[in-house]
Amino acid sequence: MHRFFFSTKDTFIDSGSSTLDGETFLDKNVGQDEILELKKVFYNRTFRNPTRVLIQFDADEIENFISSSNIGSTSYSASLRLYETKGTSGLSETYKIAAYPISQSWDEGIGKESDRPKTTEGASWKYRKNRDGSSELSWQTAGGKYIAGDEVTQSFSSESPDINMNVT
């Protein structure tokens, strides 16, 4: 049996800045963008900054499914699937992805990558919640406070650009 759970909110956060005009992305929100950009940013062959994807699922829905489906008597697995959308020209042949549970709440926000000027309302590298600068809540740790020790990691090598990560 397969059961699919879809995210209730998502965004990606970026620790860098524009190479064109220097505008910082630390407070930029893209919560309404259709694409989640998980990447390491390089400039002139030098690593500049990481991005992170934030995805939230309805924990009650998952918990109710587990408790009502007698999973304990059978083996099961859980996967996170992410699909590549922009082409593979910048994709490394080998890479590793880690998934961590986040320990603080966050707002998806209202921004898109193409917004000019940038939108700052919602989660960003610097803030987990931001309402037009009037009620900012910073992450305990910039880039998101996560629970160390509960992470899952997976290495990929010359595979499909689509990610099917075992998060069991």
What does each of the following model-derived ranges do?
Residues M1-T168:
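Secreted, disulfide-rich extracellular signaling modules
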